[in-house]
């Protein structure tokens, strides 16, 4: 969320950002937020003064009595102080809830390079890599390839677990594991520490990491424990250092999270209804970085380049798009998507999301860095995240781009050492 001090100093900048996002409903929130903030600070001052008076009035009463003076007015004042303090505290609590409600939902400040647009049709292409292959035979979609070769069983998974699940079998299990290890090896060479996070996260932490209004509908909730199965390892990694202070020398901290991801709402998109692209459960390697604010825009490009390197080495054609103001969501200040070429649909589809969240998560989570020149000075860190590989989507891209007329699939050269040097699935 935004720091209330930033809101006080920059209300016009926030209003302009909301207009770029076409989020007109929240414009009125800014005025009310500032009014509530002023009242809240007034109440703090008044309540502190009442507490000081409560502590000192006993002395005044005793002094009056010793002097033979009438202390009835002081006694009456003292009797009323607890009630006045309680009233102020109750009002402060209500105002605090309202302020937090606003701050948790007003989106991050956009970077100046984010294109203005209404929706995903106005995202801006940044670059393309590779040339889509020309096929001389009728293409199969990845789900058909997997079923025909007994690499996956969608029908039995539907019986056991419902739509959107799958059994991976044989070669696709090995391909999934190869993609995980391949991407981890690339990141480890670049100084990223592998992390296997908890697969559940409690509600308090989730509320600090993301906007639950947007995200809760896609998550599996464990009711008895007020916890959730994680939708991405980004979330537990972001909450990992909540309420802690980094030393500047320890940043940037680069993490590579490996986990299954669980998502309830998957939607449908033409040929996705049976297959690996939109599913309730998949494996993902996620890049996550805590860094000093001065470094975050350089690191944002680093994360994108890391993800691009993975798809380049897999020899999958892709494009990079800069996500526009109407499609970027609440948390990110800037976001790239990498979209891989899917020949069966004859279009690019998202396989990587790469975001700089600046201080938005860190303010909620109270994660700061101490200034190396001034021990008492601290500021909020920046957090960044990017997909390295979502294996189900990468497998779809490999199956469709590398399929052969006989139904076999060429294994990317970089994955062969992880698959007993086999050339074909």
UniProtKB/Swiss-Prot annotation:
Q: Which domain of life is it from?
A: Archaea
One GO biological process term: seryl-tRNA aminoacylation
Q: What's in the GO CC field?
A: cytoplasm
The entry marks the following residues as binding ATP, namely: 263-265, 279, 350-353
Chain sites annotated for binding L-serine: 232-234, 286, 387
**MF GO annotations:** ATP binding; serine-tRNA ligase activity
Which EC number(s) does the record attach to this protein? Answer: 6.1.1.11
* Pathway note: Aminoacyl-tRNA biosynthesis; selenocysteinyl-tRNA(Sec) biosynthesis; L-seryl-tRNA(Sec) from L-serine and tRNA(Sec): step 1/1
What UniProt keywords apply to this chain's record, in alphabetical order? Aminoacyl-tRNA synthetase, ATP-binding, Cytoplasm, Ligase, Nucleotide-binding, Protein biosynthesis
Predominant location of this chain?
A: cytoplasm
What family, per the record? Answer: Belongs to the class-II aminoacyl-tRNA synthetase family. Type-1 seryl-tRNA synthetase subfamily.
Q: What is the recorded function of this protein according to its Swiss-Prot or TrEMBL entry?
A: Catalyzes the attachment of serine to tRNA(Ser). Is also able to aminoacylate tRNA(Sec) with serine, to form the misacylated tRNA L-seryl-tRNA(Sec), which will be further converted into selenocysteinyl-tRNA(Sec).
Query: What's the protein called, per UniProt?
Result: Serine--tRNA ligase
Please name the taxonomic classification of the source.
Answer: Archaea, Methanobacteriati, Methanobacteriota, Stenosarchaea group, Methanomicrobia
Which gene name belongs to this protein? serS
């Amino acid at each position: 969320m935004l720091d209330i001090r930033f809101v006080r100093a920059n209300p016009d900048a926030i209003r302009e950002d909301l207009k770029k996002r076409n989020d007109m409903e929240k414009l009125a929130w800014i005025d009310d937020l500032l009014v509530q903030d002023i009242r809240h600070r007034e109440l703090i001052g008044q309540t502190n003064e009442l507490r000081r008076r409560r502590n000192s009035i006993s002395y005044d009463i005793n002094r009056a009595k010793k002097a033979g003076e009438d202390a009835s007015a002081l006694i009456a004042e003292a009797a009323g102080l607890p009630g006045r303090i309680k009233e102020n505290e109750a009002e402060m609590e209500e105002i605090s809830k309202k302020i937090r409600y606003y701050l948790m939902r007003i989106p991050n400040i956009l970077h100046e390079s984010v294109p203005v647009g209404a929706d995903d049709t106005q995202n801006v292409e940044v670059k393309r890599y590779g040339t889509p292959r020309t096929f001389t035979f009728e293409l199969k979609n990845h789900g058909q390839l997997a079923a025909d070769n007994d690499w996956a069983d969608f029908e039995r998974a539907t019986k056991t677990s419902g739509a959107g699940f799958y059994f991976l079998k044989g070669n696709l299990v090995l391909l999934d594991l190869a993609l995980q290890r391949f991407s981890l090896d690339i990141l480890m060479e670049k100084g990223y520490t592998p992390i296997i996070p908890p697969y559940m996260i409690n509600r308090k932490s989730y509320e600090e990491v993301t906007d639950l209004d947007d995200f809760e509908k896609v998550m599996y909730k464990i009711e008895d424990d007020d916890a959730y199965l994680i939708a991405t390892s980004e979330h537990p990694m972001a909450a990992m250092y909540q309420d802690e202070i980094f030393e500047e020398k320890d940043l940037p901290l680069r993490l590579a999270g490996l986990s299954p991801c669980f998502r309830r709402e998957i939607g449908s998109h033409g040929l996705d209804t049976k297959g690996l692209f939109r599913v309730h459960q998949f494996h993902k390697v996620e890049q996550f970085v805590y860094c000093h604010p001065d470094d975050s825009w350089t690191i944002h490009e680093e994360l994108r380049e890391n993800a691009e390197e993975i798809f380049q080495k897999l020899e999958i054609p892709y494009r990079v798009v800069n996500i526009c103001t109407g499609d970027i969501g609440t948390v990110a200040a800037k976001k790239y998507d990498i979209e891989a070429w899917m020949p069966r649909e004859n279009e690019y589809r998202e396989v990587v999301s790469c975001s700089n969240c600046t201080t938005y998560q860190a303010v909620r989570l109270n994660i700061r860095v101490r200034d190396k020149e001034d021990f008492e000075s601290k500021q909020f860190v920046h957090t960044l995240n990017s997909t390295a590989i979502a294996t189900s989507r990468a497998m779809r891209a490999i199956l469709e781009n590398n399929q052969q007329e006989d139904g076999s699939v060429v294994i990317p050269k970089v994955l062969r050492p992880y698959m007993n040097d086999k050339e074909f699935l």
